[in-house]
Amino acid sequence: KELCPYLSRLLKYGDATGPITLKSNSNYNTSIVEPTTPTRILMNFDRTCNYKCPSCRVDLIVEDSNGIKRIEKTIEEIDTYYSPNVKTLYITGSGDPFVSVGFRNYLRNFNPTKYPKLTRIHFHTNASMWTKKMWDSMPNVHKYVTTCEISIDAGTRDTYENKTRLGGKWDTLINNLNFISTIKTLQWVKTSFVVQDSNYMEMETFYNLMYS
């Protein structure tokens, strides 16, 4: 009764009857352990965004000063300990890279010499702040940004502004998409559409818009 039922029974060996002990290093095949740090880093540790999309959150999420310090500390650790072997940076699966203070500063002050093996930076964004002015403020990342995903979730202004991308402006989206289409380093651009009760009738409209 004093033991956790999930931990007291081992799948392979049955009930645990003795003390938990550490094996010596000689019991492990160390030759299969990679001595390097990760080559792909998903930077999804800031949920800051200027939208409150029903498919993602019910309120605006913006980091306060303490949160920004925590995020900047994590970025500093990546810069210091992991950057030499990184080949791909994914920014970000949790919020928006251009809205986040920490990520925005990181991109504006990006030092390529710390990332000698880097070949790709992937942006996941709502594109609301991906303007020419923003892009020009981070020149050191340009050659690495070869792919991106832009979340849209609508085929019309009304659905975009009032149902699926709350806080967004349709005209801003269209203008920024037109600019993004001129970025020569981008090899492919993915636009995403999360199907919901409020937008499923616009899937074809969205498809035609993306290819117009």
Give the predicted meaning of each segment.
Residues D79, R104-R108, E161, N178-S181, ...:
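Non-transmembrane alpha-helical segments in soluble domains
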Residues K1, I41, I78, N85, ...:
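Alpha-helical packing segments of well-folded alpha/beta enzyme cores
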Residues E77-Y82, L107-K114, S137-V141, I180:
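Leucine-rich repeat
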Residues K1-N66, Y82:
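N-terminal pre-core extensions flanking Radical SAM catalytic domains
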Residues D197-Y211:
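Catalytic cores of alpha/beta
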Residues K1-P5, L173-N176, T182-W188:
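C-terminal accessory region of radical SAM enzymes
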Residues T36-T48, D59-K73, P84-V101, T113-K132, ...:
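Core AdoMet radical
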Residues V101-R108, K132-P139, E202-F206:
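Distinct, well-ordered alpha-helical segments
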